[in-house]
Amino acid sequence: MSKHIFWISSYPKSGNTLVRAIISALFFTKDGVFRLEQLKHSTQFEKRDRLNLVKKINKNDFFKLDQLKVLSKYWQLLQEKEHMNINKGFGFVKSHSSYVSMFNNWFTNSTNTAGYIYILRDPRDVAVSWSKHANLSYDDSISFLTSFDSCIEWADTESELPPEIKPKSFISSWDEHVLSWTNNNLNVPQLILKYEDLVYNKIKTINTIVDFFEKQLEIQFNLKQEKIDNIVKSTNFNEVKLQETQNGFIEASNGVFFRKGKKNQWKKELNEKQIARLENKFRDFMNKFGYD
């Protein structure tokens, strides 16, 4: 068994990058001080250049990778160790995909997967943040969150794939995405986090992350308390936002990436009808995870 991928998974605009920042400082620094460039230590699964492999296997399929029926056949193959450039142990891999089976092809499996952290966020705030990131109206952003068929394009890295062919990640609706990662048969170590705890209960949450890796994956950290103290300070939202302002951030597709990062933005931004659309659709899951 390989178990070389540790997934950092979330619905878009739910705190994935913040968790990757914490992980990067925890695993890839001596002192726990985070810098934006350290995010290179975690990769994204859904990058177009990965798909060059498909061309070597089946040219006909290669030019149909904008069809999920074709793309899903290669999900697990693309995740195999020799294709992920993970030399030893496991690597951290970002994804916004749902953990689903499409056309009898599961997104991932327990052979490739060492474990995962899943981050969820109040869908009302996700709707606000996604609208800014994707340059959508609030109504269109809410339609994205509530649609079972929602997809986003793979990251536009240099590849042999013609630009008109646009592979997509199957995201689905917010509740289906949450369900797929929080209630499944993927028998691997898993930690479910709330974005709001990452921001407003940070010390406890970072300690939870450290405990998870120590107990579930038997990893020991040197200078643990010093690292935790520095991670708390250096991954402060305003500190990371300042780094983006000074140095830029490659993942910012539309303006700035680190915009506000606060909870309950929806109270000022969304009207009653928009709030009702989200609450009526997601009421059960919102109650389950404490989003009143």
List the predicted regions and their residue ranges.
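PAPS/PAP-binding and catalytic site of the sulfotransferase fold
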Residues: G15-T29, I192-I219, I231, E239
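Hydrophobic alpha-helical segments
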Residues: Q216, S234, D284-K288
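PAPS-dependent sulfotransferase catalytic core
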Residues: E226-N280
